[in-house]
Amino acid sequence: DPKHPKAMTLSQLLNFTAEAGFDAIDLTGYFFASYPKAPTDAEIFAIKHEAFRLGLEISGSGVKNEVTTADQALRVEGKQRIKDWVEVCVKLGAPVLRVFADTNIPPHKWQVVSGGASRDVVEGWIADDFRECAEFAAARGIFIGVQNHGDFLTTGAEHVSLLKRVNHPNCRAIVDTGKYLTDDPYVDMALAAPDAVNWQVKETPFGKPNKPLTDMRKIVKIARDAGYNGYLPIESLPMGRKDYDTPGELRRMLKELKAAIAE
């Protein structure tokens, strides 16, 4: 986050990623100071060239968008942001743009921002918007990846239902391992994994500190069983911990994930 007083610069982030032994980096849109506007070509190419120099692939990018709201102007704004950042992905060489089917207007939930619309109606809004974006992305060789984030999409079945309704080959799943709000999130991951075009591997599948850590062997098995051959991006979050060590946590997770892949 460029606005955070302790944030790394993008250049520092790239250098940490390479030094820690990652193969790729997800250059999320809000890592750029210009966000929500697209960065200039000069900024994009400077970051792209730095990643290349460090031996890093760019596995994807992502934006925040609103698709569950009854406010049509906000939904239109979100669609345009997605399209703008699809163009950024083309220039970065990133194959996937991550988008949300969940509200980003905290503390509200989709039931509130939708004005009380039914789940079926809201799913229709989302599907129509993402289908349009997927068509735009397909013409540019980019995938739209829909990430579950614990609001409209809380289960694997809901994730799959939405993608079936979108019904476009360039709109696929991003499996967020920490945001299926069920008793056994691994079951939900397995449901969505055949549609996956990318992942977000979290520290714990339960989204809270002091919960069992993610079983990397299970993650790798689910991905392999689904025929997935892409990247497994790691995401670590503070979750309110005062002693949180971002670099240390990322290194721990990477070591465990690489060991699971090597088995």
Feature-to-residue mapping (PLM):
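Histidine-acidic metal/acid-base catalytic patches
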Residues: 1-21, 139, 153-263
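Active-site cleft segment of glycoside hydrolase catalytic domains centered on the general acid/base Glu
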Residues: 107-130, 136
